[in-house]
Amino acid sequence: VLLLGMGFLSAPAKAQKVVIEDDAPNSIVLVSQDKAGDEIVRIMNETQSPRFHDPKAPRFVLTDRKGRFALGIGGYVKATAEYDFGGISDDVDFYPSMIPNGGQNYVRNQFQMDATTSTIFLKLVGRTKHLGDFVVYTAGNFRGGSKVFELQNAYVSFLGFTMGYDYSTFMDLAALPPSIDYAGPAGQVFSRATLLRYERAFGKGWKAGVGIEMPVVDGITNQSVNISNQRMPNFPAYIQYAWNKSSHIRVAG
């Protein structure tokens, strides 16, 4: 798998530069006029998606003159190759439900390559008196029909609220294991939706969230069975307890 990150850097020509760099993996280098860039680095890091296939914080960003707002432009190029020795699935992703039964016609051996999961994103972060830390994020890859660009995320987040198109509140992104296969492990809960969500941390290690989401219904239809229009939104909610940075338990419904 080949990963490539790209970014751009801008700074006032006559301003005194302060270079701010953290030492963590996938760290950020920020050039600004003063130490206000520390807040930008913190917000970029704290708002990263924990999902393995999502891009991390951009290493280079564009900032305003005071270093209070920053726009990250980045992504990665990813290519995978696979060889199927037993005709398991005629798809670039692995879905156990697509494994054919005996007697069906299928190619026993197959070689495939795919680069459609390569991702591009824009991330605007900042901090204001009334909104606190805020994030405006949009990302997409080329998983649309005929390999066209497809929106994956587009939302704004502030004061615990998230509005836009994002992963469902029902999902636990931090619980998804790393995988080469973009589809992820069998049986995982995975859903994106247009939503309005509110999340808040409280107590020691506790966090809860509730959302209003656009429902998406999928099923098998025929001449006698069809899917009707949805009259009500979904109302997912969760509560989570974490005893350290890498361990937690969550109940969602």
Enumerate the language-model features and the residues they cover.
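Bacterial N-terminal signal peptides
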Residues: V1-F8
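Polar low-complexity intrinsically disordered regions enriched in Ser/Thr and small residues
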Residues: F8-S10, K14, I40, D90, ...
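N-terminal periplasmic/intermembrane-space "pro-region" immediately following the signal or transit peptide
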Residues: A13-F85
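Solvent-exposed loop segments that connect transmembrane elements
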Residues: P96-N101, D218-Q230
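Outer membrane beta-barrel
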Residues: D64-D93, G103-V217, R231-M232, P236, ...
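Intrinsically disordered, low-complexity segments enriched in Ser/Pro/Gly/Ala and basic residues
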Residues: L9, N26, V31, Q104, ...
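Detector for outer-membrane/organellar transmembrane beta-barrel domains
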Residues: N244-G253
